[in-house]
Structures are given as C-alpha cells and as structure tokens.
C-alpha cells in the first residue's frame, strides 16, 4: 500500500510540474562582506566536526548496546560508587566497563566540539542570533543526551530510554548539517528552488524518514540487542515490527523515486541538488541492503553497528539535500544610494 501511495504521489507531482510550474527570478542585492574574527573555513570545519562527532557517538552507543556493556559502569555520572573510572569487579567484566567508560569519554569530546561551534558562531560579526541559536543546540544537545544517558543507566537500560537516546542523536546530526550550511548562507527567509508540490514531496519524504527511524528503534527494542540479557524488551512481535520497518523503507524509496522524476520535470534545479539526491538514493539502497542481510544473518553485532552508521549517513545526506533546495540571502537595509548590512551569511 505504501509503495502504491508513493508511486501515485510521484506521478501526480510529475504531471503537475510538467503542466504549469515555473520558478520566478528574484534579484537580490547582497550585503557587503562582514569582518569576522575567524576565517570561514575554520567555522565550517568546526560545524563539520559536529556532524562527525554527533554521528560517531550514535555508532559507539550501538557498540555499547550490542556488546551488553550498557551497565559496564553501573552508576552515573561515576563509573562505580566512589570512582569515575573502571575498577576491578567480580560481577562486571573489565571489557564491558571500558566500552561504556569510553563512550562516556566520547561524550566529553562531543561537548567540546559543541562548545567550539557556539564560540565560533558568537565570534561572527555582525552578531547573528539565528546562527548563534542553531550553534547553541550542539552543547545543549550534549547536556540533554547526558541526562538521558544517566536515566538509561539508572533505569536498567529500559528500552524506551535507549530508543529516545538514539533518536535525539539523529535530531542533533540533522541540526549539525544545518549548522554547516549556516556559515555560508544568509539570514533572509529561504527562497526555494522547488515549486510548492515538489516541496510537499520533500516534506513528506522527510516525515517518512523520521517514521522509518522510529520503527528501526522499535525493532531493536524488541530484538536481541536491546541491552543486557536481563533488560526487559518491548513486548511486540519482532517479525511484525520488522515488516513495518520494511514497508516504511519501501515507501521512502518510492517517494525518492517520485522526487527524482519531479526534479527532472521542474528543471532549473542546481547541480549540487542533483548530486546530493543521487548520493541519498545510493546510501538508502545500501542501508536497505544491509538491513536485509542483517536480518537474514541473525542480526550479528557488527552489522547492527554498521546499520546505525548507515542510519546516521542517511540523515546527513537527507539534511544536505534539504539545504541544497533553497537559498538564504544576506539581510540588508536600503537607504538612498547605499546598502547597510543587518546580518551576514546565516543559517538554514
């Protein structure tokens, strides 16, 4: 049913675009470059580091889960009562302690990168509150994740806390990609390269992707890698959840196919949008193939972590496609014979 719906949506969008859509030409006077305290390449590199670390900690979190190391440090924020670091313990394997402790240390690195993003955004002149607000989500997200991590440990790896932990990571990955674009865009309202029906298709695909990620966490919550052997699982049939996950994937792929036809029918689409679209299709196909192999192979630990990496990669490329579909110009105020900048390049 999802595939039929996606195909019908694609046909409708393509026909509509062929009949009547054309993009208006808008002339915008750009503001003069501002004097920033830091070079642009450094700002962008900091944001890219945020993407990598946010995605990376999702993967290392999956390693903690599939190895049963979630309670390797049974207390939080200390590893053991009276000790921040692992200690010899007759009931907790040393390797599990260090896997969990290493993941907690990586949280510190993610936090430092998040703070660096905020410092860089604050250093941009003139001050851009939109950019600062977006950058602030990086360190704030780490705080939220730290609290969730503590709740997860203290509740004995309850399945819903683990699921929320992962989904918040995916939101932060998306925001980090927007932050990368923010340092090279303006603060004006977005001007879309895509007409209305095509934007609707993009919104729908993004919504289905979100549902696909949620379904994936539910499959994990009911399966063998929800945590330690004693961790309570989600009491729903794994085959039923897996089928739901697969159906959503088929629907998502159908929407991507429809989006491709619609982009071709629209014309005047930037080359970078096409490139990111093709990369997205390839990544989604690879992720889907990996999911099938993982299921048929009995859900081995290594493939589970690779599947998490694939999920983060899909989010990265989808967010990058989103940012390539619109332009944000510089804000400015026009007086007689002059243009006075109000803000320089902004967020998306």
Q: What kind of feature is each model-predicted range?
A:
Residues 5-12, 110-116, 169-184, 248-259, ...:
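Hydrophobic cores of alpha-helical transmembrane segments in multi-pass inner/ER membrane proteins
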Residues 44-70, 210-215:
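N-terminal signal-anchor transmembrane alpha helix
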Residues 53, 140-141, 199-220:
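Alpha-helical transmembrane segments of multi-pass integral membrane proteins
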Residues 64-73, 143-166, 222-233, 288-312:
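Interfacial helix-loop-helix junctions of multi-pass membrane proteins
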Residues 65-100:
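Extracytosolic (periplasmic/ER-lumenal) interhelical loops and adjacent juxtamembrane/interface segments
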Residues 89-110, 241-245:
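Individual transmembrane alpha-helix segments
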Residues 121-136, 261-280:
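Membrane-interface helix-loop-helix junctions at transmembrane boundaries of multi-pass membrane enzymes
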Residues 212-253, 257-260, 264:
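Membrane-interfacial catalytic/cofactor-binding modules of polytopic membrane enzymes
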């Amino acid at each position: 049913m999802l595939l039929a719906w996606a195909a019908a949506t694609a046909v409708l969008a393509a026909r509509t675009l062929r009949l009547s859509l054309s993009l208006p030409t808008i002339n915008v006077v750009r503001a003069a470059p501002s004097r920033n305290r830091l070079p642009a390449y450094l700002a962008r590199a900091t944001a890219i580091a945020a993407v990598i670390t946010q995605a990376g900690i999702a993967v290392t979190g999956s390693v903690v889960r599939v190895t049963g190391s979630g309670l390797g440090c049974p207390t939080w924020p200390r590893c053991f009562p009276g000790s921040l670091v692992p200690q010899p313990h007759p009931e907790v394997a040393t390797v599990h302690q260090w896997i969990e402790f290493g993941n907690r240390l990586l949280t510190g690195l993610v936090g430092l990168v998040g703070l660096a993003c905020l410092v860089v955004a604050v250093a941009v002149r003139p001050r851009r509150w939109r950019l600062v607000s977006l950058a602030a989500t990086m360190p704030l997200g780490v705080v939220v994740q730290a609290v969730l991590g503590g709740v997860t440990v203290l509740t004995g790896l309850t399945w819903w806390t683990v699921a929320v932990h992962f989904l918040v990571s995916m939101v932060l990955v998306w925001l980090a990609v927007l932050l990368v674009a923010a340092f090279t865009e303006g603060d004006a309202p977005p001007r879309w390269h895509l007409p209305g029906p095509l934007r609707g298709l993009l919104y729908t695909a993004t919504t289905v992707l979100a549902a696909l990620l949620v379904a994936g966490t539910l499959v994990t919550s009911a399966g063998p890698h929800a945590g330690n052997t004693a961790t309570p699982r989600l009491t729903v049939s794994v085959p039923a959840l897996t089928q739901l996950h697969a159906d959503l994937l088929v629907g998502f792929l159908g929407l991507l196919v429809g989006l491709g036809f619609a982009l071709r029918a629209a014309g005047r689409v930037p080359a970078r949008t096409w490139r990111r679209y093709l990369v997205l299709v390839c990544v989604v196909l690879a992720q889907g193939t990996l999911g099938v192999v993982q299921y048929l192979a009995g859900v081995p630990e290594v493939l589970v972590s690779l599947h998490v990496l694939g999920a983060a990669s899909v989010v990265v490329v989808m967010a990058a496609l989103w940012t390539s579909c619109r332009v944000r110009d510089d804000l400015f105020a026009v007086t007689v014979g002059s243009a006075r900048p109000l803000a320089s390049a902004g967020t998306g």
